[in-house]
């Protein structure tokens, strides 16, 4: 075909296209389409030309309802502010306070009591620290006893509370009878029985952060209240031991004397506490609907396993607990020895030293319990650990140059107690927000293991402070804290609050 012919054919095609494009387009309209057009027309007139005030209100309500349907909504946790019965919270916190009183009541007189029976300062530190090691050994049997299968995932907190009361009653009894028997190891056996009672340290932390009892928004607050109860216990215990020792210093009675009187008082307090919880403690258990949901949760095979990241998190939390309580218990065990050599303090004065410090720190811990409303757990940990490290570092410098006035030492000791108390408060709360609920019990146990080991080894090192040397002991505390602080900074991003 020639080019002219090809161009002619193209021109004819373009003319036909132009005629087609210029023709009007017709659509087949059905009755359904007409109904849609009428509906759109009515809605346009309704929204655009209202005639009455009632019509205006109707238009506004319709617009707001349509608008709200376009706004994305997110599920709200209705149980975020849930709390268990207040009377039960009170009993748990009282148990925490009394447990710490039983642990610390021997601090002012432990060294002199063991020396009167032929012991040493290191043995005195063992007497103070051995109970928490025993509590670690009895932790698993207590878990089995408090978490039967019939509880459907709930923990029966009443059981460990009663067991702890019995253990403390008999532990204090044997501790008191050691002087009459003139057998130093009866002191140790009595403190070991106290250790069975100290298994409740786990349940204090667990109750205040239990996902089945406490809402997410309340966990850090209750955990800090538990720390406050512990602080008050460490205040009341040494004060009680010191003041009663001074009141009975001239007693020649082999049963009721300066070494045993405080333990007798604690025995009577535990007996009264046990009778009270039997009648007034309110246990929270699963109802029928919760039993069904709990059974489904237990049968779920798709629950996430503990990842390596979460395993490292658990190790880190246990490390924080160990180092914080190692330093606190080491300092407390060394108070009567350290102040006795530097400032010639007796048992009464060293007990007042510890008690006054706790009394001053307690209001600040109470005020800090409200920080969880504005700060994340990691921020609270960062600030608390920093204060503790700062106090220990200054103490190391002043002790090395032998220029440590009593007032300065008191301030540094109080600052260290406050910092580490606040820094270790959110550990269980943080784990409950980071881990799947399946692993919450594991987190509580891991943290409690760190606390128990630190109480034992910290008390032994504190009792042997002059065998280690004061600079060596303080340097050990500072070095351990520096390591965990660097780990906290390294893990900062992964500790951001999250829920499951």
From Swiss-Prot:
GO function terms (MF aspect): transmembrane transporter activity
InterPro entries for this protein: MFS, MFS_Domain-Containing_Protein, MFS_trans_sf
Record-listed Phosphoserine modification sites: 9
Alphabetized SUPFAM superfamilies for the sequence: MFS general substrate transporter
Residue ranges of the TM segments: 87-107, 126-146, 156-176, 183-203, 225-245, 261-281, 312-332, 351-371, 380-400, 408-428, 445-465, 471-491
Coiled coil: none
Residue stretches of biased makeup (Low complexity): 1-13
Keywords for this protein: Golgi apparatus, Membrane, Phosphoprotein, Transmembrane, Transmembrane helix, Transport
Localization of this protein: Golgi apparatus; Membrane
Region called Disordered, residue ranges: 1-23
Pfam families: MFS_1
A single GO cellular-component term on record: cell tip
Membrane association type: Multi-pass membrane protein
The keyword Secreted is annotated on this UniProt entry: no
Record-linked PANTHER family: INNER MEMBRANE TRANSPORT PROTEIN YAJR, MEMBRANE TRANSPORTER
Family, per entry: Belongs to the major facilitator superfamily.
Protein name per its UniProtKB record: Uncharacterized MFS-type transporter C330.07c
């Amino acid at each position: 075909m020639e080019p002219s012919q090809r161009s002619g054919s193209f021109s004819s095609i373009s003319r036909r296209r132009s005629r087609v494009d210029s023709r009007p387009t017709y659509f087949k309209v059905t009755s359904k389409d007409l109904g849609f057009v009428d509906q759109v027309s009515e809605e346009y007139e309704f929204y655009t030309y209202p005639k009455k005030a009632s019509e205006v209100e109707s238009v506004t309500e319709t617009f707001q309802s349509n608008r709200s349907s376009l706004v994305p909504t997110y599920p709200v946790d209705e149980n975020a502010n849930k709390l268990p019965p207040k009377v039960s919270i009170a009993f748990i916190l009282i148990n925490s306070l009394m447990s710490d009183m039983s642990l610390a009541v021997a601090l002012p007189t432990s060294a002199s009591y063991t020396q009167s029976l032929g012991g040493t300062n290191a043995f005195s530190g063992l007497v103070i620290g051995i109970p928490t090691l025993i509590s670690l050994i009895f932790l698993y049997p207590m878990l089995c006893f408090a978490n039967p299968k019939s509880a459907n995932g709930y923990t029966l907190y009443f059981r460990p509370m009663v067991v702890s009361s019995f253990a403390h009653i008999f532990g204090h009894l044997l501790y008191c009878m050691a002087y009459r028997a003139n057998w130093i190891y009866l002191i140790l056996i009595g403190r070991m029985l106290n250790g069975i009672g100290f298994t409740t340290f786990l349940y204090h932390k667990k109750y205040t952060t239990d996902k089945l009892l406490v809402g997410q928004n309340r966990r850090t607050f209750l955990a800090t209240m538990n720390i406050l109860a512990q602080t008050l216990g460490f205040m009341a215990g040494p004060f009680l031991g010191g003041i009663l020792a001074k009141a009975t210093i001239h007693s020649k009675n082999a049963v009721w004397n300066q070494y045993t009187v405080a333990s007798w008082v604690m025995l009577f307090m535990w007996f009264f506490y046990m009778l009270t919880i039997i009648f007034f403690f309110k246990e929270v258990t699963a109802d029928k609907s919760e039993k069904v949901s709990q059974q489904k949760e237990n049968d779920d095979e798709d629950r996430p396993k503990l990842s390596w990241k979460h395993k490292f998190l658990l190790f880190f939390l246990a490390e924080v607990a160990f180092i914080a309580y190692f330093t606190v218990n080491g300092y407390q065990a060394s108070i009567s020895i350290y102040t006795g050599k530097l400032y010639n303090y007796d048992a009464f004065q060293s007990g007042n030293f510890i008690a006054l410090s706790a009394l001053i720190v307690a209001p600040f811990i109470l005020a800090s319990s409200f920080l969880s409303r504005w700060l994340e757990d990691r921020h609270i940990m960062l600030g608390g650990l920093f204060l503790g490290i700062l106090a220990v570092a200054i103490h190391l410098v002043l002790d090395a140059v032998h220029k440590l006035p009593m007032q300065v030492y008191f301030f540094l000791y109080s600052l260290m107690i406050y910092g580490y108390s606040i820094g270790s408060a959110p550990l269980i709360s943080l784990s409950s927000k980071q881990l799947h609920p399946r692993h919450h019990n594991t987190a509580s146990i891991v943290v409690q293991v760190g606390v128990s080991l630190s109480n034992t080894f910290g008390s032994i090192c504190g009792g042997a402070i002059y065998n280690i040397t004061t600079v060596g002991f303080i340097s050990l505390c500072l070095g351990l804290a520096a390591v965990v602080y660097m780990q906290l900074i390294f893990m900062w991003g992964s500790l951001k609050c999250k829920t499951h």
